[in-house]
Amino acid sequence: RDQDERIIVIHNFVHACAGAGKTELIVQRCANTADQKRRLVITLTDSGQAELISRLSGVCSKSQMPDVMGWYAFMIRHYVRPYLPILFPHVRPTGFIFDRAMHPKDHFKLGGSRRYFSSNGSIYKETLPELAVKVAEASQGAVEKRLGRIYDEIIIDEVQDISRKSLDIIERLLSQA
């Protein structure tokens, strides 16, 4: 079976099984000198980001180089920080708690901002996707419209490793395309 048949491109969403060459497809798409698209490439892991930046640096001019960021940074930078005041006007994110062991055992049972934030304002990794979806819903499409003004194309790598709630964010992005 031809490798290209295993790669599915829907709008600007690339999904393929491990080893199918999707990272190379992303690199080649970004290296295309025929277009001058403003691109964002999102990947789940730090190692994935480092690999993409290294490979893209080898084939993209400075003007072609896409923004590369992690999934959690994407949710914080483009969903939570700009639109959090819609849900929680008095909360200011101060950090990010990645380590699940640092989360209170009962934070999922809590209501309001305490479900998503520690007492000092740090965002819990486990509830960040849920918070991002709630912020997007409350913004009534403003999050996706803003992303559309910033980027012509959003490419997500390593999507097979993200959480179910994170897939809701991707679904929202695809529905805006």
Regions found by a protein language model. Name each.
Residues 7, 110-177:
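Conserved helicase NTPase motor core
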Residues 1-83:
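P-loop NTPase Walker
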Residues 52-53, 101, 173:
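Alpha-helix boundary/capping detector
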Residues 43, 61-134:
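Inter-Walker segment of RecA-like/P-loop motor cores
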Residues 56, 88-90, 175-176:
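A generic membrane alpha-helix/interface feature
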Residues 1-10, 14, 61, 70, ...:
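Catalytic phosphate/metal-binding cores of nucleic-acid and nucleotide-processing enzymes, i.e., regions
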Residues 49-50, 92, 100, 168:
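Short, intrinsically disordered/low-complexity patches at protein termini
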